[in-house]
């Protein structure tokens, strides 16, 4: 058994360093997270669908469970990639459905639409947003700690979890609901423009709201209300788009498929 003096010394060092042990544990978590992507039996599919359901109807409950996860596994981030994997699968199916609907039927065109939706809209933009959120929260929003307290920090993988959680309701609204409303949304009318733009403001406002809940669940962060500020900008843009008669669904379809509706 190690001497008491050594244990206390080591404990003090970790306390002064703040995140020494957590950083080491986090470095081990990243390879494990990606390794489990290729091991379906290790994924908790039932729990993932539970999260997806409550993200749409009671997202605050999801982050209460996140707090319990911290207590049991001593990390905020999920160690199970099932959520991201299932969401990528859903997005691939949805983007393929759009490609078929708009007669983008060649194999390369379908792959192009799927690639753009999954690897640009979700993954690349998500990595960027998660990194910005991770940097901003650790740099500006952490609560000052006392000299003998452990200095906690936001895990990058948790920031990416927040993006995944926030993106799922947006996916439901702007990929699924919008798809079934296309006959209405693509009509040349003011009602179609208002309905389309309303879907977009609801989807992106919900994204920022769930993002706020994710960071607000961390007890060592303060002023997390800043993640709600973009919603005000969205409402201003919404009013401008309605006044101008801009239909965002038409604009997005034109961008993705390269033709004018």
UniProtKB/Swiss-Prot annotation:
Membrane topology listed for this record: Multi-pass membrane protein
Listed transmembrane segments: 37-57, 82-102, 113-133, 166-186, 190-210, 225-245
InterPro entries per record: UNC-50 (IPR007881)
A Pfam short name: UNC-50
Protein keywords: Membrane, Transmembrane, Transmembrane helix
Subcellular location field: Membrane
Domain of life: Eukaryota
Annotated GO CC locations: Golgi membrane
Family, per entry: Belongs to the unc-50 family.
PANTHER family the record matches: PROTEIN UNC-50 HOMOLOG
Entry protein name: Protein unc-50 homolog
């Amino acid at each position: 058994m190690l001497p008491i003096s050594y244990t206390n010394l080591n404990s003090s060092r970790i306390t002064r360093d703040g995140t020494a042990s957590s950083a080491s544990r986090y470095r081990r978590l990243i390879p494990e997270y990606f390794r489990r992507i290729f091991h379906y039996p290790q994924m908790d599919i039932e729990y993932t669908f539970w999260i997806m359901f409550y993200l749409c109807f009671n997202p605050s409950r999801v982050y209460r469970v996140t707090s319990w996860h911290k207590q049991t596994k001593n990390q905020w981030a999920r160690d199970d990639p099932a959520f991201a994997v299932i969401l990528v699968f859903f997005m691939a199916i949805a983007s393929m459905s759009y490609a078929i609907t708009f007669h983008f039927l060649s194999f390369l065109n379908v792959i192009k639409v799927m690639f753009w939706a999954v690897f640009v809209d979700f993954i690349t933009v998500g990595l960027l947003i998660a990194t910005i959120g991770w940097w901003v929260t650790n740099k500006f929003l952490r609560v000052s700690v006392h000299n003998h307290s452990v200095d906690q920090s936001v895990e990058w993988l948790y920031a990416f979890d927040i993006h995944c959680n926030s993106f799922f309701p947006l996916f439901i609204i702007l990929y699924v609901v919008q798809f079934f409303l296309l006959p209405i949304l693509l009509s040349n009318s003011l009602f179609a423009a208002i309905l389309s733009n309303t879907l977009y403001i609801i989807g992106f406002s919900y994204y920022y709201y769930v993002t706020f809940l994710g960071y607000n669940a961390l007890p060592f962060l303060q002023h997390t209300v800043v993640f709600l500020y973009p919603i005000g900008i969205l409402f201003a843009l919404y009013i401008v788009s309605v006044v101008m008669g801009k239909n965002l669904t038409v604009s997005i379809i034109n961008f993705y498929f390269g033709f004018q509706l």
